Amino acid sequence: MRNIIVEPLNQTPIEDQKVEIVERKGIGHPDSISDGIAESVSRALCNAYLDRFGAIMHHNTDEVQITAGESAPQFGGGEVIKPIEILLTGRGIAEVDGEKIGLDRIAISAAKEYLRDNIINLDVETCTVVECKIGHGSGDLRDVFARKGRAPLSNDTSFGVGFAPFSETERIVMEAENLLNSPEFKKKYPAVGEDIKVMGLRENDNITLTVACAMVDRYVSDLEEYLEIKNVVKDEVFKLASGITERNLEVFVNTADRCEDDEPSVYITVTGTSAEMGDDGSVGRGNRANGLITPNRPMSMEATSGKNPINHVGKIYNLLSNQMAADIVESIEGVKQVHIMILSQIGKPIDHPKAATAQVILEDGYTMDDITGKVSGVMDAWLEDIPSITEMLVKGQLRTF
């Protein structure tokens, strides 16, 4: 019997609160690059372990540090003067029953592949230096297969949190960044780089969006063209947001620009990321497991990217909580808003947490008796199927930032 608790949440629903703040750091932000590299290295190791040994061995690659380079962007195309330095750290199994695996090679290759796929104007070979300092350990397959068919044991006493549904402001912030960094948008407007941050502020029924968007200098001939692209970004974000909300909208783009000065200062880059010129990055310093930073909502400070997907509850429970919450809202009539909290106890099976709690705000006309059993059922089913979280992570089907 799992310890599942369902209780009413005595709180003003998010859409009725007077002030709401939401942030998303796009995939080209240095903190998000660190998250993306960490997770891609973990996923590459998982698949290498499965191919070689038939099981995922212990590892954590959630310590990626980006030290910014130096660049000289200019209209028409500038240059990277000093490369971006990327340090991969953490720990991983490099030898199993006397058989070695190329851990460093796999990690560096995964990091570079991630950069090529996601920061498309970055010359990975000449503009980055990737160094691997992941600690090496050894493993025993007998220990791994001894637990086959049983839930892994929690690596820590930790908790995960999630919520659903997204508010209008949360949807707008998430979808605006996704739009600007979509392949279709990049093909149409190649000057728009990947380093995009969207900050949303809702004051009652007025939503203000502030977008920071790195432009790629080689695709921008002069200040006039730069301003044209800024207007495109503004108009496209406004159009997207208007399809989500009927609230009043205002969109600002690159508000630090100084276009009227004798020597204009604008946000142009050589590569599309500010990591090229002074902005460092670290894992876990940006988006939470659901892709947003939401001070109005419950959040965990745990970084999810790069942690092992087998028994690291700081990763698994945060992702599981969000899956649970979304499922509850979508499948159970009468649930207006739900917060999920799951607490582990070190050394105990991860499918039997110390506590799994759902805090629920109901739609008008419903009682807790109407939904408690159904909510418990959804949570119990997800805990029973917790290996599916691991499977989705290994296949790259779950967002971790």
Curated annotation (Swiss-Prot):
InterPro entries, per the entry: AdoMet_synthase_2_family, AdoMet_synthase_3, S-AdoMet_synthetase_arc
Keyword match Nucleotide-binding: yes
Cofactor dependency: Mg(2+)
Sorted UniProt keywords: ATP-binding, Magnesium, Nucleotide-binding, One-carbon metabolism, Transferase
GO molecular function: ATP binding; magnesium ion binding; methionine adenosyltransferase activity
One Pfam assignment: AdoMet_Synthase
UniProt EC number: 2.5.1.6
Source superkingdom: Archaea
NCBIfam families named in the record: PRK04439.1-3, PRK04439.1-5
HAMAP family noted in UniProt: S_AdoMet_synth2 (MF_00136)
Family per record: Belongs to the AdoMet synthase 2 family.
Name of this protein: S-adenosylmethionine synthase
Lineage of the organism: Archaea, Methanobacteriati, Methanobacteriota, Methanomada group, Methanobacteria
